[in-house]
Curated annotation (Swiss-Prot):
It comes from Rhodopseudomonas palustris (strain TIE-1). One of its GO terms (cellular component) is membrane. FMN binds at residues 10-15, 78-80, 113-119, 134. The keyword Cell cycle does not apply. Belongs to the WrbA family. One of its GO terms (molecular function) is FMN binding. Its cofactor is FMN. It comes from the Bacteria. NAD(+) binds at Y12. This is NAD(P)H dehydrogenase (quinone). Keywords: Flavoprotein, FMN, NAD, NADP, Nucleotide-binding, Oxidoreductase.
Amino acid sequence: MAKVLVLYYSAYGHIEAMANAVAEGAREAGAQVDIKRVPELVPPDVAKASHYKLDQAAPVATIEDLANYDAIVIGTGTRFGRMASQMSNFLDQAGGLWARGALNGKVGGAFTSTATQHGGQETTLFSIITNLLHFGMVVVGLNYGFGDQMRLDQVTGGAPYGATTITGGDGSRQPSETELAGARYQGKTIAETAIKLHG
């Protein structure tokens, strides 16, 4: 049975919700799935004052955890068109895994959130995907089999590079059912690919 890790950073809960949807899709495909988050770098008093969602159920991952999975799906909100520093800091510590080829051939994918439709979704996905390719991973996006990413009747995230959600400038918009369905679809596709490659 393929093992899938959904690894995320979520300051306000939007990416946490997307991570849960990715995991649902991967489980539907028959994979064993774990959801973990990366450590918070913001001091606790600052995070509380900024209304960060600190009560997240997922355990904090370690770098060595990454080697134990057949697929790793990474999600983080955008920070100025690229991944959040918390995720970047975590992945920067994976040099030892890279050096010994521990992630070569694993399946990878990315998902993100932005405040606006044009707030850097694709560049943020690419900032994650670049890491996955350097690690030697096989990248799986959100293919157009998920046709709802082309909807024009509502504000909706989604790109062929990965599932996305739009939060609104004040963060009040939660992932829509269409966006969650995209995350589930991508999670399922990644798990199916991992099962094909790794059994």
